[in-house]
Amino acid sequence: MSDINATRLPLFFPPDFRPPCVGDADNFTLTRGENLC
């Protein structure tokens, strides 16, 4: 995993973690928290 992906995610979410409420799985790495429940 790139550190860039880790920095875009909240610190309490592991790089491999995908919130079940996020509808845009393709945009997961681009999620800034707006799509998180």
From Swiss-Prot:
One of its GO terms (molecular function) is toxin activity. There is a cross-link at residues 11-20 (Cyclopeptide (Leu-Pro)). Belongs to the MSDIN fungal toxin family. This is MSDIN-like toxin proprotein 5. It comes from Amanita exitialis. NCBIfam families: amanitin (TIGR04309). Probable toxin that belongs to the MSDIN-like toxin family responsible for a large number of food poisoning cases and deaths. Expressed in basidiocarps. Residues 1-10, 21-37 form a propeptide. The keyword Aminoacyl-tRNA synthetase does not apply. Keywords: Toxin.
